[in-house]
Structures are given as structure tokens and as C-alpha cells.
Amino acid sequence: MAKYFGTDGIRGEVANSTITAEFTQKLGNAVGSLINQKNYPKFVIVGQDTRSSGGFLKFALVSGLNAAGIDVLDLGVVPTPVVAFMTVKHRAAAGFVITASHNKFTDNGIKLFSSNGFKLDDALEEEVEDMIDGDFIYQPQFKFGSYKILANAIDEYIESIHSRFAKFVNYKGKVVVDCAHGAASHNFEALLDKFGIDYVSIASNPDGLNINVGCGATCISNIKKAVKEQKADLGISLDGDADRIIIVDENGQEIDGDGILNILAQYSDICGGTNGIVGTQMTNMSYENHYRANKIPFIRSKVGDRYVLEDLVKYGYKIGGESSGHVINLNFGTTGDGLFTAIQLLAIFSQADKPVSEFKLQGELMQQTLINVPLAKKVTREDLQKVASDVNDVEKRLGNRGRVLLRPSGTEPVLRVMVEADDKSLATNEAEYLVEKVKQKLV
């Protein structure tokens, strides 16, 4: 089991967990030393979101890298996918993002990309963890690394998207965008301006403490309200580092990551094409049935965009994502990208010329009840075995009417209990039954 890395990098409460200046400096030094060992280019890229803790953590990271002889190019406040994009474009050995994504401002973390723009695999994460716990290494003969700032890094990313989609995007509707007071603030607006979109921006005034507070992709009541007030045709909500996207239609109704994938699958020719879709264990069964009926190959990965990416590569598909709004298109990028996904959707909506609500899957979706159960420590396989018989009982009662998923969070001590069924009360009752069993046996 990983000591520091979760499903999406390293994350925790600032100063009260792993996320300290001391640890972050060791992380930078460990990765820098590993770069030297493997003879990779002695050059990395860093970026951050809008959290107040981002500055001191970034410079701690940079000091560890510089001590190991690694040059650092700082992009400033940019969305996570921009760091992945620039890492590949500028042929850096790695890319770092100081972010805790959709978490509250008191948390922070580090996402780490390899030279190909992919998140590290488990084996490489283990190597990094071993080196973190080793000696701090200084580059001999004073061959320390340099530190430079790249102003307007977002421009290269925007131009790349614009060159691909300018001929498709001619959207005439009114759009509301929620930037979660995060890394998309001003950056997303610059992208929309490039395409001539008529938009109203909310939650785009970061102060270091308001990231994700009552806004963003994990609090869509904000965008729903704004769409109705503005009489808009579309709402787009991103999270703190802009690797997630959730949209709402002209009626203020949510279309989550599953729904977005379904839209991309229907119009994949505009998005570069794909011969299959990768969802996750959380993907609603209604979409799986829909793909099967339309002869679109569909695979479920483990939850986490890194696992979606692994299966995209394994099966040779191009488009995949999660219910939570991580959407990957390997025709363009290598990680969840809320901004690029938004432009793909605007291209589709421009070409199809019908209300956003008409792009939704027709008919009732299977009903999902998801309950997060806080625990004292991270959940182990042994813990799950303690409630295996209870899960089996629920599965027997559901029969072919639904399914059960118990999933430990990869970033915090939480067990996610999900029951899906063709009836909401059935899903809720069975989920609550399992939550009680979890509390009895694991809390």
C-alpha cells in the first residue's frame, strides 16, 4: 500500500499532515534525484491553483528540485491540464501541480505528471516514496538548478485548442461559467473570449480562501441558480484545478460526467474519434445499457482518472471519464480537462443546433444513492471483508434490479457506499442498511 500517494497524487490538510514545507522540499529533492538517476532532462514544470498555501509549498518544492540540480519553469496559477500539456510540449522530465483539486482551502497537495503527460504509475510512485524517506541530496560541484517564470503560459494552451476547434465552434447561446474561485478564474474566460462565446462568469474572484466554497463542480446548486437567473442556455461548472466539469442545461438540470461522455460518444467525429468508451465502477448502468444497445464498446475502470487513462491506453480507446466530471480525450490531452471538454461540448452544441436538454440520455436513469462514511483511518481490504456478507445480502435482495459498490476514498479516510437500483427508495434503503453495518463493524 502506498505511503504518501493516493489515487490522485499526494493530498492532505496543510501543516497538520504530510503537506508541509519540509515534506514538499523532500518530495522535490526525491523526484529531482530520480530524474538524475534515470538521465532524464534536468528540467521540470510547476503550476498551482489559487490556495493561499500554494506559494510556500511551491517554493519548498522548487528548493528541493534546485538542490538536486533540476531547472524549474513556473507557470504560476494555471489549471492542472495546462501543466500536463506544457510538460509534453516543452519536453520536461516532469510536471508538478500544487493543488487539492475540489477539496476545501485548508487542504493542499501535489499532482505529479511524467514526461508523457500521464500521472505516475504505481511502480514509479513507490520509487519516489522510497527516495523521500532517504537522504536529502545536493548536486555536487554547485551545479544547482535554476528557477524561471513563464508569463502567460495559458496562451500556448488556448492557441492549441483554438487551432483544433475554431471551425466547429459557433455557439450562439448564452453561457454561465462557474470557475470555483480556482485555477480556471480568468484563464477559462480568456479561452471563451478566443472563441467569441457570450458568457457570464461567476465564482471567478479568488482570494486564497474561497476556492470551492459554495461553488464549483462539487456544488452545482450555484450554477443551477445562475443559469435560471440569467436565462442562459448552458451552465459550465469546473472545480478548483479545472480538471473536472459538470454542466447544466437550459432548465438548470445537471448533466454529470457520465452524461458528458455520452454526448462525446454520440458526436465523437467532432472530438477526433474513438472506437470505445471507458467509464468507471460508478458509471450509471443506464449508460452501459445504452452503449451496448448502440454497439459502442464500453469498459469500466477503477475510480480515478489515472485508471481511466490506463484502460484507454490498454484498449486503444480515446475518450473516457468519471461520473464526477473527469473527462479525458487522448486525441488532445492526457488527463482530465474541464476547459477542453467545455470547448468540445460547445463545438457539438454549435453543430447540432438544438437545446442542451435534448442531448441527455432519454428515459429514467438508474437511481443511485451514494453515502460517504467517515472513518478513523484509511480502509483496508481486511476492513472490507468484515462487511462482505452484508454486501452479499444486499446483492441477493437486489437481484438483477441493481448493484452495490463499496469504495474506499483514495485521498481521505472515507468509505463510499453506493447502491444503484431501478427504484430510488430501494437504493436508499439498501445503502442506509450497509452504512449501519459499516458503522457497527468499522467505526
Curated annotation (Swiss-Prot):
It is an enzyme of class 5 (isomerase). The active site is at residue 101. The modification Phosphoserine is found at residue 101. CDD domains: GlmM. Pfam families: PGM_PMM_I, PGM_PMM_II, PGM_PMM_III, PGM_PMM_IV. GO terms for molecular function: magnesium ion binding; phosphoglucosamine mutase activity; phosphomannomutase activity. The keyword Magnesium applies. It comes from the Bacteria. Binds 1 Mg(2+) ion per subunit. GO terms for cellular component: cytosol. Activated by phosphorylation. Keywords: Isomerase, Magnesium, Metal-binding, Phosphoprotein. Mg(2+) binds at residues 101, 239, 241, 243. InterPro entries: A-D-PHexomutase_a/b/a-I, A-D-PHexomutase_a/b/a-I/II/III, A-D-PHexomutase_a/b/a-II, A-D-PHexomutase_a/b/a-III, A-D-PHexomutase_C, A-D-PHexomutase_C_sf, Alpha-D-phosphohexomutase_SF, GlmM_bact. Its EC number is 5.4.2.10. It catalyses: alpha-D-glucosamine 1-phosphate = D-glucosamine 6-phosphate. Its cofactor is Mg(2+). HAMAP family: GlmM_B. Belongs to the phosphohexose mutase family. This is Phosphoglucosamine mutase.
